[in-house]
Amino acid sequence: MSNMVEIDGSFGEGGGQIIRTALSLAIMTGHAVGITNVRARRTKPGLQPQHLAAVRAAAAVCDARLAGDSVGSRALTFEPQTTAKAGNYRFDIGTAGAAPLVVQTVLLPLTQAAGASTVTVTGGTHVPHSPTVEYLEAVYVPLLRRAGLDVTLSYTNAGFYPRGGGQMDLVIQASTGPKPLVMNERGRLEELRAFIITSNLPEHVAERGAVTVERSMKAVGRKIIIERRERPSPGTGAAAVIVARCQQGMAAFSAIGELRKPMEKVAEAPCREFMQWWKSTAACDKHLADQLVLPLSFATGLSHWTTPVVTEHLRTVLWVVRQFLSIDVELEEHEDGSGAVSLSPA
């Protein structure tokens, strides 16, 4: 076992992203990791059930020894005993905890396994403070595939707060590692798509969402494909997602329905975020900018991408990666808040 990497969980954004990134890196490098001050900057610090689900999922992939793996724990030790093992995995978060975040914790390590793996995660697919499953399906996974990783994702049931019960299914093939990606500029807009997702709601709710999107996106001057998705779910819920696919760049914007929040308001929110991004020159949205760091840290050459905003999440994930890997990192920050990331092997 390699020397333990010590991570201060209060660094930067001080939330669950530090835990998930460190777990993935521990599996992929073989280093044990000790995390203190877990989620120190959150109103409820320490491990919560959805973070514990990510810890247990990561441990299953590499037979890790664990200490501090309990709800409320503010210190965690994770010691991989093997490299990532191919297998058929099922992880049940048991709540409306974010299934996409558990997926992102184990996905990249399993591309290093000796064979193909299947992963099924049940929990929340459309919940606050997490990518939606459509975000992974339409942006994150396609970019992994562009980088040469063989990953497919589908989902049947949607999971909304508080019931959860959504299901995501992945097939992950073994890979020799990602190729670098360069997204200096977004290039020509090739496809604009909207997803209107509803579960156990009257048909007019989805219709109102679609009408709102069509009206709100007229200023772009491009045809938008609107796909309505009625998904089975233990509870009720709605979401709207806007996806832009360009020659180089990609971006997506999501909003989740809430009790007594009209569908028009839900659908307007991602349209408004898209328009803000569209006025910038960035190739990626601000969330994709930090989600690309982990996979492209293992790429064989120089990767470069631009972001409309340099977020604390981006600074934090770059810091965590540098605790494990010897890579050259350059983060440009401009006066207007936008920036660019460059990563390459040292």
Name what the model sees in each region:
Residues T29-G46, A116-T120, Y155:
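Glycine-rich phosphate/pyrophosphate-binding loops
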Residues R65-D69, A116-S117, G148-A158, M217-G235, ...:
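Flexible, glycine/charged-enriched surface loops at secondary-structure junctions
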Residues H129, R146, P178-P180, E185-K286, ...:
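Conserved mixed alpha/beta catalytic, RNA-binding, or beta-rich assembly cores of soluble enzyme
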